[in-house]
């Protein structure tokens, strides 16, 4: 949402719940942004953030209601490799904290970072397998080059 700050953007889902005060809405939004690594970008607008940061705002917006399941549809689809692995690392951390994440991707390599892979084709389940050798996105991230501006 181009005209809102990160914190305003994340507050939006809570606006529909009259039981949540403005202070609680703000506090929960700040906590969600901190959880995704954007505690220092609370008042930045989308034109002041990278694609990866905007994706993190979207994830924080999904987390602000404390869901038991998070649906991430092509969450790394339009991101560069390094940013994709930053997002995957975040998802693995959320999963380690007990959150169920349904991660939709067209990239089979990305699926090796999940605990279970369900392959669909033409709307039908073609494969359903547990991954006994889950790769660590954080470890892969350490091997990727850091951009010169960081």
Task: Enumerate the language-model features and the residues they cover.
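Conserved beta-strand-loop-alpha-helix hinge in the C-terminal portion
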Residues: 124-149
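ABC family nucleotide-binding domain
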Residues: 1-113, 117
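Short hydrophobic beta-strand segments in globular cytosolic domains
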Residues: 1, 120, 125-126
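Glycine-rich, phosphate-binding/catalytic loops in enzymes
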Residues: 89, 119-121, 135-136
């Amino acid at each position: 949402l181009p005209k809102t700050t990160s914190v305003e953007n994340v507050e939006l889902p809570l606006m529909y719940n009259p039981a949540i005060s403005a202070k609680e809405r703000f506090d929960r939004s700040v906590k969600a942004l901190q959880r995704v690594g954007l505690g220092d970008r609370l008042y930045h607008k989308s034109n002041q953030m990278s694609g990866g940061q905007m994706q993190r705002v979207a994830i924080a917006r999904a987390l602000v209601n404390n869901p038991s399941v998070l649906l991430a549809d092509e969450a790394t689809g339009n991101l560069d490799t390094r940013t994709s692995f930053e997002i995957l690392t975040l998802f693995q951390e959320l999963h380690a904290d007990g959150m169920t994440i349904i991660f939709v991707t067209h990239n089979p390599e990305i699926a090796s970072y999940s605990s279970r892979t369900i392959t669909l084709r033409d709307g039908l389940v073609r494969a359903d397998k547990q991954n006994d050798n889950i790769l660590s996105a954080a470890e892969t991230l350490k091997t990727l080059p850091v951009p010169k501006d960081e």
